[in-house]
């Protein structure tokens, strides 16, 4: 199928286009922290020459324990994301967890994201798509990649075809995820842009007892492999000090490691997209 181009503010996503980065800390930790991390990420991406969509969550509704840090909540979180968008000048994405959040969130952000655990919930997926903003639909850790075409069809039935499909690992026994890179190519057959979540793919759900663990040593390896297969973008949660982050620290990438990794990913992406262009007859960057 001909690859689609999805525009998020001024940023274009397409499996045939230069890769885009979706990045930011797991959860909103306050206004100043959000502005500071967004500005730092913007400068890194501008230096490398990669487009950025800033990501952070106002609520982590699927934490391992009742007492786990969840974030500032929707109202306060959206105010912060609006400030980031306006003052830093980057498009923003955040996740929704309930159908009745979608309209309010879509009024502030440039793209919505749906959690992997909820990808089979038809009413929820359609509620996320109905406002018309682009939606990054995460594939469930239990779902075959070919099944994501039907998930996308549910969203598109609302009239919104601004859909991206995101791989974030597959459950492999208890408290472990693996990535089958074939799934990226299988999902790309839908025509929708495919995003690879390099940090949640190294998560170890519930492995720390009251919290999820992870192994960030493998983030770079998986990101390079995914880009070599060919994706529209890479999703990475990035933090200046992940060992002291309130959630998902073990699988977040230290911000100091981002620039050299992006240099590598950009080079790999260029090689892969040039090959794809030759195979399809498109010029790199064509819509």
Curated annotation (Swiss-Prot):
It catalyses: D-arabinose 5-phosphate + phosphoenolpyruvate + H2O = 3-deoxy-alpha-D-manno-2-octulosonate-8-phosphate + phosphate. Pathway: Carbohydrate biosynthesis; 3-deoxy-D-manno-octulosonate biosynthesis; 3-deoxy-D-manno-octulosonate from D-ribulose 5-phosphate: step 2/3; Bacterial outer membrane biogenesis; lipopolysaccharide biosynthesis. Keywords: Cytoplasm, Lipopolysaccharide biosynthesis, Transferase. It is found in: Cytoplasm. GO terms for cellular component: cytoplasm. The keyword Transferase applies. Its EC number is 2.5.1.55. It holds the Pfam family DAHP_synth_1. One of its GO terms (molecular function) is 3-deoxy-8-phosphooctulonate synthase activity. This is 2-dehydro-3-deoxyphosphooctonate aldolase. It comes from Magnetococcus marinus (strain ATCC BAA-1437 / JCM 17883 / MC-1). The lineage of its organism: Bacteria, Pseudomonadati, Pseudomonadota, Alphaproteobacteria, Magnetococcales.
